[in-house]
């Protein structure tokens, strides 16, 4: 999530391969009914645990570790930081800024011991703050940037002239990379137009910082390129001296950094592998104007096939790499331009940077850590790069719920697809982090977020996040939460704290996610088809308009987000392509076809398999989709031509590529690409038939026209399949699923909420029916054998189970009565400036009230306390029927009692209760207690002048209360 947070602050050894000890973390998970009902804590969500630097105590750390285990949090990623403002109190600043001291490592050791006792796993962020670095990193070991200096040349001037220094970031340590002479043909805005044929590389002629350059006219420029440290320092590092960010493009520096933070002086060696699992590195948004490295030129020549030196001008574009510069100066244009093929030069440069990052940082990190029993967990994006290939280079590739700004399914699947293609068994997600959404996370929103990321391929949630319990002067009664700060205008979710009123309900979400993640770790992922992704970037303005939680926003429930001011660099080619492809993805969802993206590197290593399938690193897919492609790498086109000749199934939609993206001999390469594609398109295994998707033989096929049902599939060792379904709509949906594989004889619907397994029986045409509640998920197990540990349970409690498994289905239910009028009571309603302290409020009682969203109620609009709704009503009961009470729309937790008996609680949709055992003939007393969020109360504090929340006062308010309609159904 550092992308957006960094924007806010900007505006205010590669060792030889060794046997991996880290692989112990990747044990196979075999499904059993018993383990599903009560999975190990390792399958529970993790949380990012923020420390106020080293201002912590051993006693409190141990208490919080035990609390995490009780809360069904399976692990913690420790992230010490200095974001404590205001920072009052004697000695507080010194304690905060004492990261990386013996006392700090004593605190870490205490946590490791407590984690072992409580069965928790521990990850560490790479140092403190981000990006990784510190005083052990020198300026020479900082990330490097390519900078430029320009001078005018005079005709017939034989006197040596000084080489121009870098216009930006010049340092004594700067190293000359290249000196070019080029003729300028004009300008276009701020861009200097250059004649490519005039470019001369005169680097070899430079002597003592000077060069003699005779030219024929005044139009010539002397252009010098310099390798310069970008001077980036770790942000929010809990140390007086942050030093420098490490050079991610030099494996020796990467190893030096790990030696420092994990070396013998830290005492952490004995914990590596138990409970210390991984080191975490955030996404790769750095301050370099154009990334560079000592071995860039050599690597470029080897990997791209030509000398980049004469073409370096096309790669000077401020804001292209450096997002901070893009924020400060939006709309910048390239400094130089040659012609319409400059995009190819940038593509080749980007791909080389991708190669270098993967070689030095990703592979270097993985080898260093895995050889010591640890893993490298990292967010493999932030640059124009082979994102899927990079995901394959991480031990645990990670995404976030702000990935590529909008957090669309397509963006998330860039990471999960890479993990699947390269056989990375765990895919993590920094979850419930949303920009501008602090204090708006409710159990319902959290459940939706969990289902969205799991259905996008995640199987390890890392909450963002939990602050150390800390109450410095100047903070509200809820304590320190680093990602909401009024003075700095910092605003990110989520406040996973004991002081959050939903803390008890968060435990329910954790238990649900624990079971669901257990299922999503069983076996291996299986996608039916692959969609070729030709780009090195995922556009930040692209998202499926049908998706929920775009930018973390719930329309009509939450205040509208502020205007998006992220100012991303987006290519129209990428953005337009992504905006077109959502219709295809919607169609795949309708048909129940699971899918992944695929990159060039994977297709170039693919082999043909039986029955038209394609094999990539042992994973088989039923086909490849080529969708409206603007270009394709030449080697990919040749590889696909060969695969198609061997019978690999391919479906083409729209235009096929007529060019490739590299500048290397581009005319000939384009011609060869066209030839390969033309040959491929004529082969019998390749079709442009719009109905070709219907001919795919799927193990499970959706027969109902519903594009709102998302799915993901796992294949178990015995051939069984586990398929997750998520109803993304706010309506009940009836889904018909056809089973096309005769080996499956036993079917079960698995409910991760309560751990139940309900046998299902296909009809005569091998179809299963299931009613999906609004925003609900379900998991289908199809197996050739009965589920382990289930049959005995089924036989022993057959009658009882029949009663328990009657599920509400609105299509089969009859409305008995509406319940529109209720008596309301709030025990302590905050009023006036005392709203900062709920205990200062007064009680409120209202009789015969219509149900409504509290935004429309002047008395309850800013209430943050539970509200009780009471109704005494007469009910005619038929003993042969089941009765269900549907509360309608609830904001956000509802507990129910009937006639003094506790029925239960619901923390997310559907807010439906089976009330059959609790109703009696005649009058019934129904009591509903609704717990709202804390958001509107905090808005009121801002309105009342509380400076800590003044930025919330004009944001609007969120839906709260019981809006209904409340209805009783008979079934």
Question: PLM features: residue spans?
Answer:
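Bacterial Sec-dependent N-terminal signal peptides
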Residues: 1-24
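Mature N-terminal segment immediately following signal peptide/propeptide cleavage
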Residues: 31-75
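Carbohydrate-binding surfaces of carbohydrate-active enzymes
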Residues: 43-46, 61-62, 75, 93, ...
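Acidic/aromatic-lined carbohydrate-recognition and catalytic surfaces
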Residues: 81-205, 214-215, 225, 234-235, ...
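Extended acidic/polar, glycine-enriched regions
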Residues: 186-266, 764-809, 813, 921-923
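Short acidic/polar inter-strand loop motif in beta-rich domains
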Residues: 230, 786-788, 931-939
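Aromatic-lined ligand-binding clefts that engage carbohydrates, nucleic acids, or primary amines
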Residues: 873-899, 926-930
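Short hydrophobic beta-strand segments in globular cytosolic domains
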Residues: 903-904
């Amino acid at each position: 999530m550092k992308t957006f947070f960094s924007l806010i602050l900007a505006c205010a050894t590669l060792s030889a391969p060794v046997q991996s000890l880290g692989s112990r973390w990747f044990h196979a998970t075999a499904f059993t009914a018993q383990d599903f009902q009560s999975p190990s804590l390792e399958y529970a969500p993790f949380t990012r645990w923020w420390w106020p630097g080293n201002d912590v105590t051993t006693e409190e750390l141990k208490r919080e570790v035990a609390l995490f285990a009780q809360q069904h949090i399976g692990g913690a990623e420790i992230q010490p930081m200095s974001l404590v403002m205001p920072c009052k109190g004697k000695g507080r600043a010194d304690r905060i800024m004492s990261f990386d001291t013996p006392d700090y490592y004593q605190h870490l050791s205490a946590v490791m011991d407590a984690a072992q006792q409580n069965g928790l796993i521990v990850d560490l962020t790479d140092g403190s703050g981000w990006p990784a670095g510190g005083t052990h990193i020198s300026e020479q070991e900082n990330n490097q940037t390519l900078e430029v200096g320009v001078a005018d040349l005079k005709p017939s001037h034989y006197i040596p002239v000084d080489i121009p220094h870098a216009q930006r970031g010049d340092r004594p340590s700067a190293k000359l990379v290249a000196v070019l002479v080029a003729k300028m043909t004009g300008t276009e805005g701020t861009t200097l137009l250059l004649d490519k044929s005039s470019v001369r590389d005169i680097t070899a002629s430079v002597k003592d910082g000077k060069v003699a350059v005779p030219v024929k006219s005044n139009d010539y420029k002397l252009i010098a390129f310099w390798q310069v440290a970008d001077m980036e320092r770790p942000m929010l590092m809990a140390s007086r001296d942050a030093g420098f960010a490490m050079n991610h493009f030099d494996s020796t520096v990467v190893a030096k950094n790990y030696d420092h933070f994990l070396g013998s002086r830290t005492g952490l060696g004995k914990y590596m592998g138990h409970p210390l699992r991984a080191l975490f590195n955030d996404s790769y948004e750095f301050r370099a104007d154009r990334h560079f490295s000592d071995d860039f030129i050599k690597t470029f020549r080897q990997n791209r096939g030509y000398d980049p030196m004469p073409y370096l001008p096309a790669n000077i574009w401020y804001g292209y790499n450096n997002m901070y510069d893009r924020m400060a100066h939006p709309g910048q244009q390239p400094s130089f331009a040659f012609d319409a093929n400059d995009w190819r030069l940038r593509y080749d440069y980007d791909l080389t940077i991708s190669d270098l990052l993967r070689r030095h940082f990703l592979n270097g990190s993985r080898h260093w850590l895995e050889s010591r029993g640890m893993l490298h967990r990292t967010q493999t994006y932030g640059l124009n790069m082979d994102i899927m290939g990079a995901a394959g280079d991480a031990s645990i590739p990670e995404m976030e719920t702000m990935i590529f700004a909008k957090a669309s399914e397509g963006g998330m699947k860039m990471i999960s697809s890479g993990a699947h293609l390269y056989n990375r068994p765990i895919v993590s997600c920094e979850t419930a982090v949303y920009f501008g959404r602090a204090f708006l996370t409710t159990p319902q929103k959290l459940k939706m977020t969990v289902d969205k990321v799991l259905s996008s391929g995640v199987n390890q949630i890392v909450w963002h996040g939990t602050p150390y319990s800390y109450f410095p002067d100047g903070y509200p009664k809820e304590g320190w939460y680093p990602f909401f700060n009024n003075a700095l205008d910092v605003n990110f979710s989520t406040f996973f704290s004991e002081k959050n009123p939903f803390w008890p309900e968060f435990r329910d979400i954790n238990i649900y996610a624990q079971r669901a993640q257990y299922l999503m770790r069983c076996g291996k992922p299986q996608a039916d088809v692959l969609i070729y992704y030709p780009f090195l970037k995922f556009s930040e303005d692209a998202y499926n308009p049908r998706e929920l939680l775009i930018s973390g926003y719930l329309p009509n429930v939450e205040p509208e987000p502020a205007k998006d001011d992220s100012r991303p660099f987006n290519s129209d080619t990428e953005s337009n392509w992504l905006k077109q492809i959502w219709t295809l993805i919607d169609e795949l969802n309708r048909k129940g076809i699971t899918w992944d993206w695929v990159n060039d590197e994977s297709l170039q290593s693919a082999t043909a398999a039986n029955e038209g399938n394609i094999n990539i690193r042992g994973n088989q897919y039923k086909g490849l989709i080529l969708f409206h492609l603007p270009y394709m790498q030449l080697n990919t086109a040749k590889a696909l031509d060969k695969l198609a000749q061997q019978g690999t199934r391919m479906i083409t939609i729209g235009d096929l590529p007529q060019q490739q993206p590299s500048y290397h001999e581009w005319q000939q390469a384009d011609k060869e690409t066209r030839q390969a594609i033309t040959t491929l398109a004529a082969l019998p295994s390749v079709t442009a038939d719009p109905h070709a998707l219907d001919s795919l033989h799927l193990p499970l096929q959706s027969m109902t026209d519903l594009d709102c049902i998302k799915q993901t599939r796992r294949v178990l060792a015995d051939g069984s399949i586990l398929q997750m379904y998520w109803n993304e709509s706010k309506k009940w949906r009836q889904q018909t699923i056809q089973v096309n594989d005769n080996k499956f004889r036993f079917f079960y619907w698995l409910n991760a909420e309560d751990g139940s397994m309900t046998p299902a029986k296909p009809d005569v045409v091998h179809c299963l029916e299931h009613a999906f509640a609004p925003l609900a998920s379900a998991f289908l197990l199809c197996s050739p054998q009965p589920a382990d540990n289930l049959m005995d349970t089924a036989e022993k409690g057959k009658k009882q189970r029949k009663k328990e498994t009657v599920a509400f289905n609105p299509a089969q239910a009859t409305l008995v009565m509406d319940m529109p009028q209720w008596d309301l009571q709030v025990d302590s309603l905050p009023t006036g400036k005392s709203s900062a302290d709920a205990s200062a409020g007064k009680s409120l009682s209202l009789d015969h009230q219509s149900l409504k969203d509290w935004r429309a109620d002047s008395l309850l609009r800013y209430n943050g306390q539970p509200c009780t709704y009471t109704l005494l009503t007469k009910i005619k009961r038929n003993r042969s029927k089941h009765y269900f009470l549907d509360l309608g729309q609830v904001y956000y937790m509802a507990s129910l009692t009937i006639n003094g008996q506790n029925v239960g609680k619901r923390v997310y949709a559907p807010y439906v209760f089976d009330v059959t055992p609790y109703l009696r003939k005649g009058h019934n007393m129904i009591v509903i207690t609704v717990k709202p969020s804390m958001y509107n109360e905090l808005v009121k504090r801002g309105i009342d002048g509380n400076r800590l929340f003044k930025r919330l006062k004009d944001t609007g308010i969120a839906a709260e209360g019981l809006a209904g309609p409340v209805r009783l159904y008979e079934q």
